[in-house]
């Protein structure tokens, strides 16, 4: 799981920088790719984490940012 994300990130990061010249858009695009990792990094029970990641995939970017912000404040 982690290896596939890292390989994907390794190949996608240069393309994101090419397609998104504006730094804000670039950082949002990178965050949108990295954000599913937050579910696995956060201290959630294993069975809850699988359910959360399935629900997490349906969130918009704004909702992901709000969730990430609330998790980092705990």
UniProtKB/Swiss-Prot annotation:
Topology relative to the membrane: Single-pass type I membrane protein
One cellular-component annotation, GO: membrane
Spans within the Extracellular topological domain: 19-21
Signal peptide: 1-18
Bilayer-crossing regions: 22-44
Key words of the record: Membrane, Signal, Transmembrane, Transmembrane helix
Segments in the Cytoplasmic topological domain: 45-74
Main location: membrane
Domain of life: Eukaryota
Annotated localization: Membrane
Function: May be involved in the regulation of telomere length.
Name of this chain's protein: Uncharacterized protein YOR008C-A
């Amino acid at each position: 799981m982690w290896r596939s994300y890292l390989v994907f990130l390794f190949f996608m990061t240069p393309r994101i920088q090419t397609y998104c010249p504006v730094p804000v858009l670039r950082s949002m695009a990178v965050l949108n790719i990295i954000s599913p990792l937050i579910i696995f990094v956060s201290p959630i029970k294993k069975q809850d984490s699988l359910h959360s990641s399935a629900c997490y995939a349906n969130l918009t970017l704004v909702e992901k940012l709000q969730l990430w912000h609330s998790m980092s404040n705990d």
